[in-house]
Structures are given as structure tokens and as C-alpha cells.
Swiss-Prot record:
Location in or out of the cell: Mitochondrion
Record family assignment: Belongs to the universal ribosomal protein uS3 family.
Keyword set, alphabetical order: Mitochondrion, Ribonucleoprotein, Ribosomal protein
Gene Ontology molecular-function annotations: RNA binding; structural constituent of ribosome
GO cellular component: mitochondrion; ribonucleoprotein complex; ribosome
Gene name of this polypeptide: RPS3
Name listed for the protein in its UniProt record: Small ribosomal subunit protein uS3m
Amino acid sequence: MARKGNPISVRLGKNRSSDSSRFSEYYYGKFVYQDVNLRSYFGSIRPPTRLTFGFRLGRCILLHFPKRTFIHFFLPRRPRRLKRREKTRPGKEKGRWWTTPGKAGPIGCLRDDTEEERNEVRGRGARKRVESIRLDDRKKQNEIRGWPKKKQRYGYHDRTPSIKKNLSKSLRISGAFKHPKYGGVVNDIAFLIENDDSFRKTKLFKFFFPKKSRSDGPTSYLRTLPAVGPSLNFLVMQYFFNTKNQMNFDPVVVLNHFVAPGAAEPSTMGRANGTGDRSLQKRIRSRIAFFVESSTSEKKCLAEAKNRLTHLIRLANDLGFAGTTKTTISLFPFFGATFFFLRDGVGVTNNLDAREQLLNQLRVKCWNLLGKDKVMELIEKFKDLGGIEELIKVIDMMIEIILRKRGIPYGYNSYFNEVQKMRSFLSNRTNTKTLIESVKIKSVYQSASLIAQDISFQLKNKRRSTHSIFAKIVKEIPKRVEGIRICFSGRLKDAAEKAQTKCYKHRKTSRNVFNQKIDYAPAEVSTRYGISGVKVWISYSQKKGGRAISETYEI
């Protein structure tokens, strides 16, 4: 008789091999699991809820290996249910940047009128796209194709991630950074987080951590806010990238869609219509104020330019934040993008021709996205006040992911053109072969490993009961999944004197059939009542011709 607790089909080779119609977190997530805090990573890709921030624009993770560097950009996609809602709501505004063809400024309008509309856009059905940029110094020719081509995924291998509360410890013991040549660099990163007081006194650190945690230790800041962990992880990986490649620049500014509360500047407008509008205004003003502080200097030569920029931003706020009218000044292309602020006299910044060319590119970007003469004059003012040689901070490298009105492969011309420019730009600046891959993920709740980890986090925090956890997962699973079975074991309640096992199943599930496609993952969690275990089985449909759960398009 077959053992129910150890499925035979999981041990089959075909269920571990690559399959283009299956979701594989190993393809893009294994390195992230090992080298970045899993709690922060999972919180950045999961759909938003009422208690969490959800998905954030401009998320970026850098992973450096002996011969290549991975840069992961996480970008949202337009939800499919938005079309149906627009038909039933004729009074709502339809001229949005993700639906209007030929819109100048794909990132130029991130404002939504109400909290309901923003939840509608970033709802649970919102799809994600991962921009994975691999900087590979191996001599590998990458053919540029006009039409995207599907690629096969890697197989399932090691599913066990290294989950550590302390980020510095996770960097020290992670498998990807165990190389002896990079041991000293990893120790320097951990030492910087734990012992560098000047780093914790910077404006960038105070922006993401406005309030000090009650617990002692520098790493206690990780538990301050839900949006804090990914930002700090990004800074750490960026510091590692800086050390190995000798690219001297200040910490990267990532302007997320949500910011830490308490960092907002005073309101410049009258009373808002509702609580949601007031909170949105605070978030927008806090992002704008932080951009002004980061992009300008304390020198007297830039004081006038800083005042003009601040006045221009406040004028944009009073006009209605990045609206679609001709009298509105939109500054939102700066939000959701990634800026590299380099210093003068270091590395490649001595090349005046390259800097002039980059500033010209920035002028073109602003003209296309903003289209305002005042912004053009402001850029010229930055150059005239301090001069090219005396500027302390200038935008020397700008990697901007353009969000187009349609996803891959629809509207591939405009998207692929931007990706091609980015690839050539990175190749010239880093002297390496650059490969950009776009991965479209349709749903998160179709991998047993991710579901098991999510359940373990909820049990540890004692947020919900086992029944409510299972009911929520059932609502999120896609149609491709034929059935799901979840088993909880251990002391699940305080009143339970003995350990017990609870199993829930939905639809058709089978754990011991040879010809069945099954994904299996266990997880353990330490709760206040003891150690509890979670096991997840997912049965996939055997029908042919179904859509792939995750697709990769070669550019």
C-alpha cells in the first residue's frame, strides 16, 4: 500500500524536470531566496491586502556572483478585470496611461482619484512582470529578435531557502556568497550594517526608518515597517555591486509607490475630500520632498535651483498632481524609476562628453514625459549654476523601466525598443555582455513552495486560523491548478494539549499516481506553542493546449 505522506509522483524525474507549462520559482527566485530576506521578498511580490502594502513600483534587487550580476526589476501589469469594471462604471475616468494608446509618459501619471480605484488597479488579479537583467562577462552572442521567443524553464532542484531574521547573518551563510574570493566582501557588508553609525545617520536611512524600534541592535530597523525590509535589502546588494565592480556612486534612491509614514511634508493645498485623498497627498508630497533632498546639494550655488524645483513641485501639487489636462505639470516620471547619483572626480564621471550626453538624454526624457518649458529651463539652470565640473550630484546614469500601455507580447515594439537601448547602455558602461529577460508571472498562488512559506509566516504571527488561511488560498489559485491539499500538524491552539493534524482539500487531489503532475513542498514554523508543520500538494491539470503559467521572452 502506498504511503500517503510521501507522494510517489514527487520523486519521479519528470515532475522535477523543466516544463514550459508549469510555474517554477527556481528560475528567478532561488538566488533571491538564498541571498535576500525571504519575508521581504515574498511581501514584495504578493498581491496587496488591507493589512499589507502589497506590490511596490520600482522594486529592484541586485545579486552579484563570481562571473555575472543579476538585477531583478519587479513591475506590475494591468489586471484583466479592469476591462469589465470600466464597462460597468461609465462615470469613471478612462483616459489612463495603461489603457490610452499613444500616451506620452507611461510613468507620467501614477495618481488614482480614489482609494477604490487604486485597489482596482493593484488588485489581487494584477499580473506581475519581472525584468531580470543579467550582466555576464562571458563571450556569449545574444541575437536581437523582433518577435519574442519562449524559452524552457530550469527544473526543480533545491527547494530549501535560508530564512534568517538577521540580514547580515543571512549574507554570511548564504550559499551563493560562500566563494572564498568574496568572503571578505560579504563580511564587510555585514560589518557596515551592524557597526557603521554614519550609514544609519544618512537622510536615505532616516527616510526609510523614521522611527527607531524599541528593540536594541542595528538590525532591529527591519521590523519597523513592512516596506522597510526590501528597501534595506536593495541598499545592501547595491553596496555589494559597488564594491566588486568599482562603480563609485552614492546609495541608489528607489522611490516606491508607498513610503514610510511620518516623512510627508506639510500640505500645500486645502482640505481633501476624504481620508484616502489626504493619505495619497501625503505619500506624493513625501516622495517629492525626498526627491528634492536627494537630487540637490547644500551648496549655495544650487540653492536657487533647489528653491525653483520646490516651487515647481508645489505648483504641480496645487494643479492636481499629474493630471491629464494641459495646465498640469506631471513630475511622476521620477517616481517608479531608479536613479544613480555619482560623484565628481571618481571613476567614469571624469568623462565630460559622456556626462553631457547623459544630460541630453535626460532632457529628451523630460520633454517626452513632461513636455513643459519650465522643466527644460530647470535642467539648464542646474548646468549653468555649478558647471559640469563643480556639480556634487548629477544624474549620470539613469536606468528607467518604461511601463507601457500593453504587456508582452502585445505592444512589443515600444517595449523592446526601450529594453534594447537599456541593454546597449549597460553593456557600454560595464564592458560586459548584457542579457535582458522578461518573465511574465500570472499568479503567485500556484507553487507549493511559496504557499507553504506564506502559511508558515501566518502561523508564526498568529494572524488567522487554519480554515481561514485555506479559504483565502482557494480563492487565489488559478484555473490551471486542478486541486490542492494542505495539512497542518502540531499544537495549533493554546487549548490543545496534544498535537493534532488537520487536512483540507479542494477539488481533485491525488498523491500517489504515477502519471500525475504534482508539486509538493513542506515547511516548519516555530510558534509559541511548539513546532508546527505544513505540507502542500498541488495537482496540475493534464489538459493540453492550456496557457503557460509563466513565460519567458527572449529579447
